[in-house]
Amino acid sequence: MGFHQISVIIVVLALASARAADEFPSHTDTPTDCPEADHGCWCHGSFAQCWRTYEDSRMTEEIGNRITQLELLYQPSEEVVTYIRRISALRELRISEDGMSLDCSCDVIYALDDKQVTLVNQAELTFGNCRERGWPRERMAARPFVHRCHVLRMQDGETRKRRGADDNDGDDVSKRASPRKGDEPAGHKLKDLAPQNTHHLVNIHDADKHPASEFVNFISGHRRSRRSTDDDAAVSDDSERGARKKRYGNQGNYPQAMNPQSRGVNYGQPAQQGYGAQGMGGAFGGGQGMGGAVRGGQGMGGAVGGGQFGAFSPGEAEADNADYDEYSDSLDEGDTTISAAVMDDIKAVLGATKIDLPVDINDPYDLGLLLRHLRHHSNLLANIGDPAVREQVLSAMQEEEEEEEEDAANGVRQNVLNNINANAPGNAGYGGQGGMGAFGGGGGGMGAIGGGGGAMMGQQGMGGVPQRMGGQPQGNAYNQGYRQG
């Protein structure tokens, strides 16, 4: 080979080198597993070197699965993230700042963390345009920037956890405190509540039967069965009031239970608030002989079979006792006992509230307490997913609320009347005890001001009905618990 040929080869190589220097950023060798140089990537030592966007480089999935080390030139932050996420086998990354500065975007750091890729030139790398993204400086070195991005990510994670916990606990019934005694009930009045579509807190085990239906049937069915009779006018609601009175004694103006052996006789008690003592009932008659401070006492029972001016007539006493016995017998049958599974469902509806569970479901007072507690937490009813079941519970609670309001109003009125009677003139009263006769009823005393409503004189020994003076007995129209003439 002559000198001339050697010179031509040198010139060609020099031109090729100059062209390559203009077209490519650096020198490279070309192993078979490297991308093609004319697509914007080639191999530079052990690194694959790319200077075009991911789409323009025509990086195939097969080549991307073989590249473990990558160097990116002149790429913005968005393209750096794309390369990191698209090349599955990548383990090390070198980012060159030649001709371009990376923006202060933590997305690059988050992508490196997610793919477990190491930034090998972290010590000499810097990020720019930081003030535009809310950082205190215009440029930041890579190490402190990476550290701050890690701190921000941990803080964001904690914030998301707290927000998620707040969203999950926003309607958690276990975080609601039970209202203190005397506070207004939470939420709206029951009559203003409307069914709502909410999540179930009670699991539906059967498509045709809600697990709370047994509890609802007990509330709206058995306990209110006396309200559902054909003749409501002939049925008294006093058995339930009597059950509540039985727990607390004779308070709240509830009637006393009659003595069936004496045909509804109320035996004498010490005089209170200016009234005379109650008359002693006879063996067959019954009634109260009271000398009232303002009103006259009620007449004693007359002939055999009992008088008609007592607190209750014998027929009413028998009817009341029969209803009470029927109620007690139905409780003994065992068909109203709530099972443990249903009690668990009730607890699930109530949540971890402060009611003392388990209550005695067969005790009307305890059941009323449960209903009142549900009313104070009326928003818990929205967690009953079945609209029909929710309406039944709302109806039962509404009846309980109306009944309590009626009892409270009657108690206030009765207390007012008692105070008027106690403070009226003639407070001592002239009424004495009615006599006790074997057959005839004793006469009631005349009041100091009002006319006596009882019999002044009975037909002794004849068993006749006592004659009355001073008109009809003065009844108490406000207290429905007493059945007066």
UniProtKB/Swiss-Prot annotation:
Ranges annotated as biased composition (Low complexity): 465-475
Signal peptide positions on this chain: 1-20
Lineage: Eukaryota, Metazoa, Echinodermata, Eleutherozoa, Echinozoa
InterPro entries: Bindin (IPR000775)
Propeptide, chain numbering: 21-247
UniProt region (Disordered), positions on chain: 157-195, 219-273, 305-331, 459-485
Family: Belongs to the bindin family.
Subcellular location: Cytoplasmic vesicle, Secretory vesicle, Acrosome lumen
Function: Species-specific sea urchin sperm protein required for adhesion of sperm to the egg surface during fertilization. Bindin coats the acrosomal process after it is externalized by the acrosome reaction. It binds to sulfated, fucose-containing polysaccharides on the vitelline layer receptor proteoglycans which cover the egg plasma membrane.
Keyword terms, alphabetized: Cell adhesion, Cleavage on pair of basic residues, Cytoplasmic vesicle, Fertilization, Signal
Key word Phosphoprotein present: no
Biased segments, Acidic residues type: 317-331
Composition bias type Polar residues, residue spans: 250-264, 476-485
Gene Ontology biological process terms in this record: cell adhesion; fusion of sperm to egg plasma membrane involved in single fertilization
Region of interest (Fucose-binding domain), residue spans: 371-379
Protein name as it appears in the record: Bindin
Gene Ontology CC, one term: acrosomal lumen
Biased composition (Basic and acidic residues): 172-192
Superkingdom of the source species: Eukaryota
